Amino acid sequence: LAIGFIIHIIWASVLTLQNQKARPVKYALRNQSQNATWASRNMYILGAMVLIFLVIHLYNFWWNIKFPSLGTPLSAITVGGVEMEDTYTLVSSLFESSIVYCLIYILGAVLVGLHITHGFWSAFQTIGFSNDIWRKRLECLAYFFAIVFAVGFSIIPLYFIAGLGN
């Protein structure tokens, strides 16, 4: 997965540089037409913001779970006779301690959703589904998938903001 992200970032950087070299002089008036969504026009910046969110997310969760001696040590709980790390306490302590972190996490989920929206249908366009019939269907599917993703990941901090964590 990590290698896939690295390749994705490198390829996105190469494509962005190629696009900039193809048109070294910027347009005098930027066309805000329906041919290009906000996400597609700002994909590289959106990707950078998603990367920042991903680093924050991995540091706060993955790092603390995989390397508890270097971060916040996790307590152990027993579920069904199996001892495991108490990751619920880690998640709840982060979201209950700061409304700012909750808002950053919700914003991050929305940014990932926007990034996915363009990337989803664009990937299918790359492999040949670029006619008018398929493009509209894939755009709808991309929006649906992005909304499910953003709402799904936003539910966790919203759950704690609403005070339902205890």
Where does each model-flagged region fall?
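Membrane-embedded alpha-helical bundles that constitute the cytochrome b-like, heme-associated redox core
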Residues: 1-166
